Amino acid sequence: MAKEKPILNVAFIGHVDAGKSTTVGRLLLDGGAIDPQLIVRLRKEAEEKGKAGFEFAYVMDGLKEERERGVTIDVAHKKFPTAKYEVTIVDCPGHRDFIKNMITGASQADAAILVVNVDDAKSGIQPQTREHVFLSRTLGISQLAVAINKMDTVNFSEADYNEMKKMLGDQLLKMVGFNPANITFVPVASLHGDNVFKKSDRTPWYNGPTLAEVIDAFQPPEKPTTLPLRLPIQDVYSITGVGTVPVGRVETGIIKPGDKVIFEPAGAVGEIKTVEMHHEQLPSAEPGDNIGFNVRGVGKKDIKRGDVLGHTTNPPTVAADFTAQIVVLQHPSVMTVGYTPVFHAHTAQIACTFMELQKKLNPATGEVLEENPDFLKAGDAAIVKLMPTKPLVMESVKEIPQLGRFAIRDMGMTVAAGMAIQVTAKNK
């Protein structure tokens, strides 16, 4: 059997009206991942609903409600092959109330494609576009390319394309720490397929790669196998004749039968008997693998979702408190010392209290604007000290980035996102 192509997870980010879903649908169609007949059927459905041009978007917008509203709600995953990779698309929603999905979606991505509407050069960069790029950067995505879409609406004008490219570079990418010189920009018309998989003859002035070629130029992710083992528990099952079977995704390190392990903050210690993925026993599992495993010496009641597994020689850090850099995405009032919202970190959901507001930062450059601010409001970035109200595993992003990022939820919305820059371990 031919060796399988490596998998590359690519997030599609940007404002809701930039044509992300259409770009993705076009990649899937031209990449041979969907039947052309499906597009014909969806085109008819779109036209009947007065949404002509939405047929490609419908491929990703599988949920009926999304089709009627024309927005992408949940994070959808679809695959297509390129010359080099098996690409899994993480189509991230654009609407503000779905930023939580964006946070959980983007954190699974190896690279991101920012889709923008060429016409935004006239109206300015959309706030959502800024937020998505900033979040991707905060969530550790270092590879980015830009698709400047809807080129057909400006008659494939090179001047309009260059204006948009310059505006993005000067007003957004540089500010969040991307070097525009290292980013590939592609002029596309996704609805018609120009420069998506196939070179367009309508952009004779452009001699760069197509969007599919840009994806092939991304570097494959390096699996963090040399970092300490960290496996956040998603669920715990008790299987007759087998025993306790926790399941979760290996974030860092390697797990294999015979390993002596500890679950934190539960403190339960055991030995790995077997490791399974897709009902097959594995000699070992590595980062990215979703596994079930059997542990000797640990009962179902001893551990729960939100616990993190590590080796007894290097146990996960239970935080007494931690200092974090956060960005406030939205908040109806202000955040002050004493505020205690729920933190979503790996698989845990634990309320944490704001103990100190240490510095307010310029969200785009990171420079300090104010020491010890009295409050934080929407749009602010800050360094804060936090204390979990119950035991929580948190690692510093410098040491184990996969376990140092979090979203902060309150009142049914994601109010902030951030990363732990320093963690004080709880004394046992």
Curated annotation (Swiss-Prot):
InterPro entries, sorted: EFTu-like_2, EFTU-type, G_TR_CS, GTP-eEF1A_C, P-loop_NTPase, Small_GTP-bd, T_Tr_GTP-bd_dom, TRAFAC_GTPase_members
Protein name (Swiss-Prot/TrEMBL): Elongation factor 1-alpha
GO cellular component, one term: cytoplasm
Enzyme Commission numbers on file: 3.6.5.3
Coiled coil ranges: none
Stretches the record annotates as G2: 70-74
Keywords: Cytoplasm, Elongation factor, GTP-binding, Hydrolase, Magnesium, Metal-binding, Nucleotide-binding, Protein biosynthesis
Chain positions covered by the region annotation G5: 189-191
Region (G1): 14-21
Source superkingdom: Archaea
Compartment annotation: Cytoplasm
SUPFAM superfamilies: EF-Tu/eEF-1alpha/eIF2-gamma C-terminal domain, P-loop containing nucleoside triphosphate hydrolases, Translation proteins
